Amino acid sequence: MVKMRIAAVSAGALCLASCNVGPDFAPPNSGLPNVPFASAASVTSSKEASPSTETPKPVDPMWWKAFSDPKLTSLEQRVALANLDLQTATLRIAESRFQRGSAAAAELPTVQGDAKYQRELYSQNGIASLLGQLAPAGSGSSPSIGALNDYTPGFDASWELDLWGRVRRQVEAADAQIEAAEDQRRDTLVSLLAEVARDYIQLRGAQALLNNAKENLKVEQDLLDLTRTRQEKGLTTGLDVENAAAQVDGVRALIPGFEQQEAEQINALSLLLDLPPNGLRGELVRAGAVPPTPARAPIGVPSELARRRPDIRRAEAQLHAQTADIGVSVAAFYPTVQLNGTLVLDSLTFNNLWKGSSVQYQAGPSVSLPIFEGGKLKSILELSKAQQQEAAIAYHKTVLQAWHDVVNAMVAYRTEQQKRSRLADQVAHSKEALTLARARYNDGVADFTTVLDVARTVLQAQQQYVQSTVNVSIDLVQLYKALGGGWEKTYPEAPTGAALKEAAN
C-alpha cells in the first residue's frame, strides 16, 4: 500500500513537472501555393520573345555565380567576413543566447553562501542590565557580559518548482527569440549580398558609360576636324565648325560625371567591406563589362519562400515567442511553490564552530497564491494575447509582401529585357544612319546639322542601352533578393557557442 502511494505521488509530481499552461505553438500556414510563379510575360506583349526566362528549378544559394564574374564572386565571399552590420547582427545572436541562459537558470536551484564574524560588547546599562534580575538573592553581585565573538558561516538555498511551466514557457520564448535573431542576421546577409552585386553592377555600368563617352568624344572630334578641313577648302561655314565644337564640348562634359559615379561606387563597395575610401580602387579601377545575366534564371516555387526568406522565418519565430509569452501570463494565476533551506554554523568560539552542536538549519516549502491584484494579472494576459494576434498579422503581411516582391521583380526583369532589345536595335540603326549622314555631308548632299543630330542620337541610344543593360542585371539581383537566397551557404556561417562569447567580450 505504501509503495502504491509513493508511486501515485511520483506520478503526480511527474505530471505536474510536465504541465505547461497556455497554448502550444503550431507553425502557421503560409498560404503560398506549391506551383510555379505566374508568368510575368502575361503583363507584356505576347508577340515578343523574352531573351531570358525563369524556371521553377530550386534557387541556387550562390546565385551571384550566375553572372559568371570572378570579381563579383570574390566580393560576395569577402563581405560576409568584413561587413560591420553583419558583425552587429552576429552579436545580437549572442545577446539572445545569453538572455536564454538567464531565463533557463530559473529552472535550477539557487544556492548562496555567506559567512559573518562579529565581536560584540553589550552595554551594562542596556538590555544586559536585566541579567541582574537573574542573580540569586543575597549574592551581592550581578552578572555581566563581556565582549563576545560570533562566528556564523552558512548557506541559503531555494528552488521554485516549475509546476505550471512558467519558466519553461520563458525558455521557449527565449529560444524563439534566438531563432529570430539568427534570421535577422540572415536577412542582413541577404541584403548585403544584393547590395554588393548592385553596387558592383552600377560600377561597371559607370565605367561602360565613361568608355562610351570617350569613344564618342573621338567621333565628335573627328567630325570637328572634318568640318575645319572643309571650311579651309571653302566647302562649309564657321557656323558648322562652331556647332561641331559645341558638340565636342558637350560630350567632354559628360566624362567628369561618369568618373564621379565610378569613384562613388568604388567607395560604396569599400564601405561594405569595412575598408577606407578608395580601399578597392586598385582592384576595381580597371574597367570591366557589366555582368551578363544567364539565359535561364531558376526561381523555385512560391511555397519555398516561407522556408527561404529570412524575414518570413523571423516573423514566424516572433509569433512563436509571443505565443509562449501567453503561457507565462497564464502561469501567473497559479500558486508558486518554492523549497527553501538554510544551514548555519553558529558559535561564540572558533574552536567549537565545526562541531555538530553548532549546526542550526531551517527547511521547508512555501506557497504563494495571488488573491487580489486589482486586475493586473488579467490585463497582462490580455496584453499577451493581443501581442500574439499582432504577431500573427505581421506574419501574414510579411508572407504577402514577399509574394508581391517576387512577382514585381519578375515583371521588372522581363520588361527591362524587352526594353534593352529595342534599344539594341536603335543603336544599330542610329549608327548606320550616322554613317549615311556623314557620307551625304561629304558629298555635299546633306547639311551638317543632320550629321550633328544623328551623332547626338547615337550617343543617347548608346547611353540608354548601357543603362538598360545595367538595369537588367540589377533587376535579376533584386529578384534573387526577393526570393531570399544567399544565406544558406555563407562566408562564414554564423558563429556559435564559444565564438559568440568571445565576440561579446
Question: Could you describe each region identified by the protein language model?
Answer:
Residues 234-237, 402, 409, 444-448:
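Alpha-helical heptad-repeat coiled-coil segments that mediate oligomerization/polymerization in large
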Residues 145-149, 357-359, 460:
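Short sequence motifs at beta-strands and strand-loop junctions characteristic
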Residues 2-9, 15-81, 128-138, 144, ...:
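Terminal intrinsically disordered/low-complexity segments used for targeting and assembly
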Residues 87-88, 104-105, 161-189, 239, ...:
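Sec/SRP-type N-terminal targeting helices
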Residues 231-235, 441-445, 482-486:
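A short glycine-centered flexible hinge/capping loop motif at secondary-structure junctions
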Residues 149-159, 199, 301, 361-367:
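Hydrophobic, lipid-facing positions within transmembrane beta-strands of outer-membrane proteins
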Residues 20-195, 337-341, 371-381:
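Short flexible linkers and secondary-structure junctions
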Residues 167, 183-301, 412, 416, ...:
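Periplasmic alpha-helical coiled-coil/stalk elements that build and connect Gram-negative outer-membrane
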